[in-house]
């Protein structure tokens, strides 16, 4: 399953569960929003910028997705860095301005392939949620550290 299908399935699932989509992106879509490194971390204008695959909000919660077509450890590392070092906090605050978001959670969306799910589960300490999807558009929550999908 391609990253585009993973993202579209998750977008549909989020919207059907009351999440407001703020931005989304998948390969060749051209729809994403570039988040810049905070000024104190930036060396060049767009260097180090990232484009999240999905940012959505519900109530006072924001969620930040990185979606892939399979397991990539580097995405877990990237999300952990974004989460713990707040390197993109200025751009996120600006993007979510006026939405009363009190917390942002970071996670991964992947296809429902057992080998990739098992590899992903070895890195759960770096993310807040792990979600998979399949060709039937089902979405499975494998990990949700703070119950954001059941409580929001």
Regions found by a protein language model. Name each.
Residues 136-152:
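Charged phosphate-binding loop/patch that engages nucleotide di/tri-phosphates or the phosphate backbone
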Residues 17-18, 62, 67-138:
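Catalytic cores of nucleic-acid endonucleases
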Residues 7, 47-50, 88:
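Amphipathic coiled-coil/heptad-repeat helices and related helical stalk/stem segments
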Residues 31-38, 117-118, 140-143:
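Short, solvent-exposed polar/charged micro-motifs at secondary-structure junctions
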Residues 22-61:
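Active-site metal-binding core of divalent-cation-utilizing nuclease and nuclease-like domains
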Residues 12, 55, 96-99:
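A general structural signal for short secondary-structure junctions and capping/turn motifs
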Residues 1-19, 23-26:
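Nuclease catalytic cores
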């Amino acid at each position: 399953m391609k990253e585009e299908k993973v993202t579209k399935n998750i977008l549909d699932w989020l919207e059907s569960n009351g999440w407001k989509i703020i931005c989304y992106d998948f390969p060749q879509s051209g729809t994403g929003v570039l988040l810049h490194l905070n000024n104190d971390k930036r060396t060049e204008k767009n260097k180090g910028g990232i484009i999240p695959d999905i940012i959505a909000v519900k109530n006072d919660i924001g969620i930040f997705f990185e979606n892939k077509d399979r397991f990539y450890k580097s995405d877990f590392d990237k999300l952990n860095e974004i989460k713990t070092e707040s390197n993109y906090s200025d751009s996120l605050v600006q993007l979510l301005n006026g939405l009363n978001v009190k917390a942002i959670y970071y996670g991964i969306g992947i296809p429902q392939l057992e080998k990739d799910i098992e590899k992903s589960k070895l890195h759960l300490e770096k993310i807040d949620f792990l979600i998979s999807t399949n060709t039937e558009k089902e979405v499975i929550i494998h990990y949700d550290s703070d119950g954001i999908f059941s409580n929001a």
